[in-house]
């Protein structure tokens, strides 16, 4: 049996990207082997601890270790993230093993997560990375993309842009495509998906500025029109979409060009408000155009997939895929025993598995980041947009900046994660080489600067208890929400609180503890008024356009921070003017500076993803792009019946 294991790195992916999320594998010194950052998975070294006689370290003990590598003991020294070049990866990006591929086999694909999956298996409705990892196997978007993230015309459809005419013409590349139930795929299924997301009763999170940019969408969404005037069907296999403005990100994977298809022959007869609970979304009747289809489901635990005989690229090379949720406590020992063939390895245990002989390792820079953000308003459902509250507790950007300077991300990245994790200077991560600004000022660890900022802004300790009061002398107490992941995460969150206290800020955990991930995001999305700031993580896909995460109408804009200046910059990034490469770079640099200055969110950690590949897997790579992909699940081949041990 072939087994794959994928670490569930982040809880959320951006609104237009459904992708596998490979977690970071981090080496660390012996004394800090069980530490891990706020969203990364942690697995205890069962065998190692038995051998060395180690017990679980308490939160206090972990906090002491963190302080030793970058807490109070270094409070006088600033560490630097700004203008730091992209480091080399620890391993190659691909591996080829000896042997002749066998025919078929069963692939066991484990999603490492502390919580069960929700079971929403529809691209248009899925909103967390666990469901999305499953959904991407049973459905495909229309377009493929190359290693520069740009759309190609090699997928289900091709696209032709007319920038001056403000249109995109989408044409299916064949008249013979079929859904997994054998029914034909036509352009009506593409149009139907656009209409579904634009429907006023749509329950998902993907209705955003990209869809509102289609001519006539506003009237359709409000119910004034029964169709979208800007969606012009040309024939059964092509459509011309008219936009209010052309955006450069239309050319990118996960960008602002709609890419989903929905089987109209199924969902047109089901009220849209009932889709999420239907058997076609929750059960075994799911229909898509991906390489697999669902055979059986154990709710929250596992999904068994079999090949889609109508998949347009041909039959899967394996006979079956079992995708199951796996506890983070067992990953390393199971890989060591040969129980899984491909594993996105946990950050905390590099020393425990780096010398394994039954696997090879490959690396990639992950398109994701950890962050801390501030709750500054609410999402107004009636208006369909984020409303910033000027009187929010965290409305002062100086207070937010001071909090950012108080955290030593490089210390945790270097000492805890042995350099495979690090701080970064920008909300645009370095993997977006074309628009990332290496010279952007970052929030380098500088507690003295944090204290000075707070002093100058009037946040002073007026009663001698070591904690600062508000400018008016009233008590300043800040509630901080974070996800429950593992003991290492709990320890790092406690260290955050110590770093905050070091600069005189009374910041406590919301409810006094971390929250289970689904509850955490439920509270954040509901704009719980008791939450002032929170730590999360984003898998951001291949389009750096900030509109979907920080736009005025973006439901994923969890901080709810909007402003005329920010809207203007986002508008320029998405404008026709930005088709000019120099202008595009200029606008993205403006955005990076603006986010830094306003500090409504700041990145904490970025890093490298390391994957273990069992030596019976013929070939595996970690490079981006689907045009010439060789490592999608349906393409993987095995060279033996049993795993190498």
Task: Go through the PLM ranges and name each one.
Residues 109, 299, 460-537, 609:
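Ligand/substrate-recognition segments at binding pockets and active sites
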Residues 280-283, 307-353, 506, 515:
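Ligand-site clamp/hinge motif
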Residues 393-498:
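Append "and occasionally in soluble cytosolic enzymes with long acidic Gly/Pro-rich linkers
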Residues 107-163:
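N-terminal lobe/hinge region of extracytoplasmic solute-binding protein
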Residues 255-313, 320, 447, 452:
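Gly/Pro-rich hinge or "lid" segments in bacterial periplasmic/extracellular proteins
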């Amino acid at each position: 049996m072939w087994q794959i294991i994928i670490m569930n790195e982040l809880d959320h992916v951006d609104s237009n990207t459904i992708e596998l999320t490979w977690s970071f594998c981090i080496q660390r010194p012996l004394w800090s082997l069980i530490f891990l950052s706020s969203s990364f998975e942690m697995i205890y070294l069962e065998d190692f601890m038995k051998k060395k006689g180690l017990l679980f370290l308490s939160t206090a003990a972990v906090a002491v270790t963190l302080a030793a590598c970058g807490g109070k003991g270094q409070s006088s020294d600033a560490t630097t993230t700004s203008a730091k070049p992209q480091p080399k990866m620890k391993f190659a990006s691909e591996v080829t093993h000896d042997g002749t591929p066998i025919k078929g086999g069963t692939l066991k694909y484990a999603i490492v997560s502390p919580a069960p999956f929700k079971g929403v298996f529809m691209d248009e409705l899925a909103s967390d990375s666990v469901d999305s990892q499953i959904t991407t196997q049973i459905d495909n978007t229309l377009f493929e993309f190359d290693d520069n993230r740009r759309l190609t015309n090699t997928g289900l459809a091709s696209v032709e842009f007319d920038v001056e005419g403000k249109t995109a013409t989408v044409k299916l590349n064949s008249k013979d495509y079929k859904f997994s139930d054998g029914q034909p795929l036509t352009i009506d299924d593409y149009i139907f998906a656009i209409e579904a997301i634009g429907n006023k009763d749509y329950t998902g999170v993907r209705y955003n500025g990209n869809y509102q940019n289609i001519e006539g969408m506003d009237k359709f969404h409000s119910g004034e029109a029964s169709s979208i005037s800007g969606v012009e069907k040309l024939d059964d296999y092509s459509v011309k979409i008219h936009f209010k403005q052309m955006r450069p990100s239309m050319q990118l994977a996960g960008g602002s060009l709609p890419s989903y298809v929905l089987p109209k022959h199924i969902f047109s007869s089901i009220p849209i408000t009932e889709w999420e609970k239907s058997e076609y979304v929750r059960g075994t009747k799911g229909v898509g155009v991906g390489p697999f289809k669902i055979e059986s489901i154990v709710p929250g635990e596992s999904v068994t997939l079999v090949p889609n005989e109508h998949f347009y690229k041909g039959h899967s090379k394996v006979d079956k895929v079992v995708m199951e949720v796996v506890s983070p406590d067992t990953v390393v020992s199971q890989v060591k025993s040969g129980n899984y063939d491909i594993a996105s390895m946990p950050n905390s245990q590099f020393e425990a598995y780096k010398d394994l002989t039954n696997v090879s390792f490959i690396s990639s820079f992950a398109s994701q980041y950890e962050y801390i953000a501030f709750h500054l308003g609410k999402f107004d459902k009636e208006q369909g947009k984020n409303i910033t509250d000027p009187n929010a507790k965290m409305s002062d950007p100086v207070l937010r900046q001071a909090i950012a300077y108080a955290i030593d991300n490089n210390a945790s990245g270097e000492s805890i994660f042995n350099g495979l994790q690090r701080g970064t200077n920008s909300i645009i991560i370095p993997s977006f080489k074309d628009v990332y600004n290496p010279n952007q000022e970052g929030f380098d660890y500088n507690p003295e600067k944090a204290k000075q900022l707070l002093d100058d802004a009037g946040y002073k300790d007026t009663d001698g208890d070591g904690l600062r009061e508000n400018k008016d002398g009233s008590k300043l107490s800040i509630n901080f929400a974070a996800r429950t992941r593992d003991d290492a995460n709990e320890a790092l969150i406690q260290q955050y609180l110590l770093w905050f206290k070091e600069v005189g800020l009374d910041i406590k955990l919301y409810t006094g503890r971390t929250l289970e991930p689904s509850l955490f995001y439920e509270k954040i999305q509901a704009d719980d008024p008791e939450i002032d700031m929170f730590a999360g993580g984003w898998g951001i896909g291949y389009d750096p356009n900030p509109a979907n995460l920080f736009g005025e109408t973006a439901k994923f804009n969890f901080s709810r921070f909007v402003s005329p200046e920010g809207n203007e910059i986002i508008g320029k990034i998405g404008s026709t003017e930005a088709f000019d490469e120099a202008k595009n770079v200029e606008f993205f640099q403006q955005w990076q500076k603006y986010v830094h200055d306003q500090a409504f969110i700041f990145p904490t950690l970025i890093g490298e993803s390391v994957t273990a590949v069992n030596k019976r897997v013929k070939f595996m790579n970690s490079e981006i792009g689907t045009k010439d992909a060789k490592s999608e699940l349906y393409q993987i081949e095995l060279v033996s019946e049993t795993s190498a041990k």
